């Protein structure tokens, strides 16, 4: 792995059958988006990968762990990582509430993007309006 300059995105394998996304925004701040980690912990493998990618001297770096939409099964982590990466590239999304992907069409959307050889933002669920 080689050092990257911001902005940058990287999909990581955690070493535990799981895929996550790291982002370094234009200010150099690093975010870790994990669709199946409500405790927000970082594996040793991921820490090593991120220090090699984002640290100028290979030391550990501070990482922000924002709240993100959590997957409801054990197989969608890769699709979520790609969706988050795409959202960052199009809209500078670095995590946080307010973004909910339409999980029922995520895989079909990814297949369509790959077929077209062009990523597009993943479909989202619109927030429900509250009637008064």
Where are these regions (language model features)?
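C-terminal helix/juxtamembrane-tail motif
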Residues: 105-132
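Cysteine protease-like catalytic core of ubiquitin/ubiquitin-like
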Residues: 1-113
């Amino acid at each position: 792995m080689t050092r990257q300059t911001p902005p940058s995105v990287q999909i990581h394998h955690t070493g535990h059958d799981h895929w996550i996304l790291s982002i370094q925004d234009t200010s150099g701040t690093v975010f870790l988006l994990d669709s199946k980690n409500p405790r927000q912990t970082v594996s040793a493998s991921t820490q090593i990968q991120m220090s090699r990618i984002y640290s100028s001297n290979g030391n550990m770096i501070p990482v922000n762990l924002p709240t993100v939409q959590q997957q409801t099964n054990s197989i969608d982590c890769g699709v979520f990582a790609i969706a988050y990466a795409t959202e960052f590239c199009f809209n500078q999304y670095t995590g946080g509430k307010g973004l909910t992907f339409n999980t029922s069409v995520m895989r079909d959307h990814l297949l369509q993007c790959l077929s077209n050889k062009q990523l597009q933002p993943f479909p989202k669920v619109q927030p429900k309006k509250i009637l008064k």
